[in-house]
Design a protein with these regions (language model features):
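PLP-dependent amino-acid enzyme catalytic core
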Residues: 1-177
């Protein structure tokens, strides 16, 4: 964007993950978890916990791969997000934030594979695919990247992107916002 570039006196690039099918980057980690799992680990389905975006991603992915699911949504979840999960045929269970991960552990004992919202190697690798895309896009523009601003919630996004980008641009400053 010329106005932004001129304002900051540098090239500024944006990566809009809101245009992903599930509405956020969260599907990357969920998909990578599924693709990296043994069939036996998925035979009873998946479980996830979230206030919104990860629940949508887990619902989306379980629908694509035709997996049973138990999606724990916080009682405070936005009704719009709840409806998106329902549209992906999610088995939604309401929980409070205090007991949410306890509920997921119970589902794990029933044989459901837990897809963590921001932690675990497969989740971080999924987020890392975003870093690979950014690196390829920057290289295709025959330029480099000195700084990147990445939003921080649970830390999975910045960890995945940062790890990937450091492989291509060791000098990069990774800034959490």
């Amino acid at each position: 964007n010329k106005i932004i570039d001129e304002t900051f006196k540098t090239n500024v690039f944006f990566k809009f993950e809101c245009f992903q099918k599930s509405g956020s980057f969260k599907a990357r980690g969920a998909i990578n978890n599924i693709l990296s799992s043994d069939k036996e680990d998925l035979q009873n389905g998946i479980t996830a916990v979230s206030a919104g975006n990860h629940a949508i991603a887990a619902s989306y992915v379980s629908n694509i791969f035709k997996l049973k699911n138990k999606i724990f949504l916080y009682e405070s979840a936005n009704p719009y997000r709840v409806n998106i999960c329902k549209n992906y045929r999610a088995n939604i269970l309401s929980t409070n934030a205090t007991n949410a991960f306890d509920e997921v552990r119970k589902a794990e004992k029933e044989g459901y594979k837990f897809i963590h919202p921001f932690d675990g190697a497969y989740t971080l690798q999924g987020s890392g695919t975003l870093g690979l895309e950014i690196a390829n896009q920057i290289k295709n523009l025959n330029t480099t990247i000195d700084n990147i601003l990445i939003s921080v919630g649970g830390g999975g996004l910045i960890s995945g992107i940062g790890s990937a980008l450091k492989q291509f641009f060791p000098h990069i400053n990774i800034i959490g916002v």
